[in-house]
Amino acid sequence: MGCLIREGDDVLLFLDRRRTYLVRAERRAFHTHKGVVQLGELIGRGYGVRVRSSAGVEFVALKPDVRDYVFKMARGTQIIYPKDLGLIMIYTGVGPGSRVVEAGTGTGALTSVLAYYVRPSGRVYSYEVRPEFIEVASRNLERAGVREYVELKNKGIEESDVDAVILDLATPWLVVPHAYSALKGSGHFASFSPTIDQTVKTVKALKEHGFVYIETVECLLRGIRVEEGRTRPETLMTGHTGYITFARKGLNI
């Protein structure tokens, strides 16, 4: 039957692709605009089970993945969207065993994804100067099940010989020298910036500090409405969210 839902487990109630609800399997009622779902009825049943609300509307109980936690986590800052997160993971080569420095934890969206991919032997060292966001990020990481792979810090970059440094800051160009010092030779650098002015300053700093293979990309995501005989692009799309700059560390002789 697969993985059974235990009391206290997270469940993603799927109504349709625009309406999903991250809940815990507890002995209580969950109220929606489509009726009441008795969450206790999920306990002991398998993920993927279909349940009906008091109004007779069907929900599917799915096991949340890292994308669901990113979208549903408590926020206090703008998060990096999954379309951009995917590019960052591929371009930086982060995987099991990687040691990664992140600057700009925010509420932990990128941190959660990094921690998910460095498991089980890797480590994420995440820096955030605002204590209130560290607390929120810690709770979000705990719920996503990846807290043990992350060290949350609030000052300085102390690490060295890391595989990747990833920045989500207002002034990333100021951190470029520290990123260079922290990286191993050939290590990966990535920086997410919403404006082109930030990006220009960051690229200039990268060139001045021995980085190579510098490139900046923007990812636009358009959904497709698939219906037999009338397939078409969605009216709305996820357009500009930011510019992502990548680079590699070249050793200075």
Question: How would you name each of these model-derived features?
Answer:
Residues 95-106, 165:
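Conserved class I S-adenosyl-L-methionine
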Residues 186-194, 198:
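Conserved beta-strand signature within the Rossmann-like core of class I S-adenosyl-L-methionine
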Residues 1-63:
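N-terminal auxiliary segments of SAM/dcSAM-dependent transferases
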Residues 207-212, 220-253:
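Core SAM-dependent methyltransferase catalytic element
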Residues 115-116, 173-187, 207:
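A short glycine-rich, Lys/Arg-flanked "PGG" loop and its adjoining helix->strand segment in the class I
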Residues 95, 118-119, 146, 183-187:
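Helix-to-beta-strand junctions that scaffold the AdoMet/dcAdoMet cofactor pocket
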Residues 127-172:
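S-adenosyl-L-methionine
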